[in-house]
A protein has these predicted regions:
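Bacterial N-terminal signal peptides
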Residues: 16-27
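N-terminal low-complexity, Pro/Thr/Ser-rich intrinsically disordered segments
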Residues: 34-44
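A short glycine-rich, aromatic-capped structural motif
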Residues: 43-122, 149-152, 235, 242
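Functional-site microenvironments in short loops/helix caps that host divalent-cation chemistry
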Residues: 61, 65-71, 109, 114-115, ...
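Short, structured beta-strand segments at or near domain termini in extracellular proteins/domains
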Residues: 296-306
């Protein structure tokens, strides 16, 4: 049996927030358009490639203030991170349709992983295209987020996508992920709590409880996008990042690059999943996991340098 994932418990608070979205460009149309503007949505191939949205360059304060409800020591100190070069992030977590394209193209067969109730990931078969099977009524439509891959498999997908498109894809660093989640906001969330319900974000994210309408994962894009045009940043599934886990931000990169170590026992993950309380969904909330861990609550999204 795999060791228990390194999961902690947090709390949350409010803020304000908008929306956004723009045009969908194919790679050829984009080439004619020149440098894409922030908010531009594109795909590097018509089929099987994730939809990407261009984020603005700029700076933000990474981490959380001492008085933020639910704050943990690893969320500080607050520090400035600056992005000087444009990049894009996938609008949604990688979906089963996109993951299946990788599985089918490479012939990879995902092995069994976590078999504990609520985290079931059993090996797929050839007739299933290598996709794992799940317990209960777990949804596996093409628009649900792909789950159950470990860190190495997520990295393999990124390498495959880069080779397929000829474009530089990568996993997001923690700072990229937080920048995209905050979308210009500075509080715990880029949206307000549900009216009259403290610590409830059912109108904005899929977390613990039936109020949001989902007992397991929701199809990607089921909740509103943030001001950068990115979806599902505060619930549904946790997501792998490119960073090794660090106890705080002392010595953290200030340019948005991944913070890695030669010997990395725990890998940083971000977001929150369908089975955890909203307090874990705060933009600055951090978590970590063994790199070889699997679960029906862990997936990933990708970043593309422009």
């Amino acid at each position: 049996m795999n060791p228990e994932p390194h999961v902690r418990h947090r709390r949350a608070l409010p803020v304000l927030a908008p929306l956004a979205l723009l045009a969908l460009l194919t790679a050829s149309a984009w080439a004619q358009a020149g440098t894409p503007k922030p908010g531009t949505v594109f795909k590097d191939c018509e089929k099987d490639c994730p939809e990407m949205v261009v984020l603005p360059t700029g700076s933000f304060m990474m981490g959380t203030p001492d008085d933020e409800v639910g704050r943990q020591a690893d969320e500080g100190p607050l520090h400035k991170v600056t992005f000087t070069k444009p990049f894009a992030i996938s609008r949604f977590p990688i979906t089963f349709a996109e993951w299946d394209a990788f599985i089918q193209a490479t012939g990879y067969m995902m092995p069994s992983g976590d078999e504990r109730p609520g985290r079931l990931c059993q090996a797929g078969t050839a007739t299933q295209g290598g996709r794992p099977t799940y317990g209960g009524n777990y949804p596996v439509t093409s628009r649900h987020p792909a789950v159950c891959m470990n860190l190495k498999e997520a990295q393999d997908y990124v390498a495959w996508l880069s080779n397929k498109t000829g474009k530089p894809y990568r996993l997001p660093s923690e700072s990229v992920r937080e920048y995209a989640a905050r979308a210009g906001s500075t509080g715990p969330f880029p949206f307000p709590f549900d009216e009259g319900k403290e610590y409830s974000i059912a109108k904005h994210a899929n977390t613990y409880g039936p109020a949001d309408g989902y007992s397991y994962t929701a199809p990607v894009g089921s909740f509103p996008a943030n001001a950068f045009g990115v979806y599902d940043m505060h619930g549904n599934i946790y997501e792998w990042t490119a960073d090794c886990k660090h106890d705080n931000y002392v010595g953290a990169p200030s340019d948005g690059s991944p913070w890695q170590e030669k010997d990395c026992r725990f890998q940083s993950i971000r977001g929150n999943d369908y089975g955890e309380a909203p307090v874990f969904s705060r933009s600055g909330n951090r978590n970590d996991l063994y790199p070889n861990e699997r679960g029906d609550w862990i997936g990933f999204r990708v970043v593309r340098d422009l």
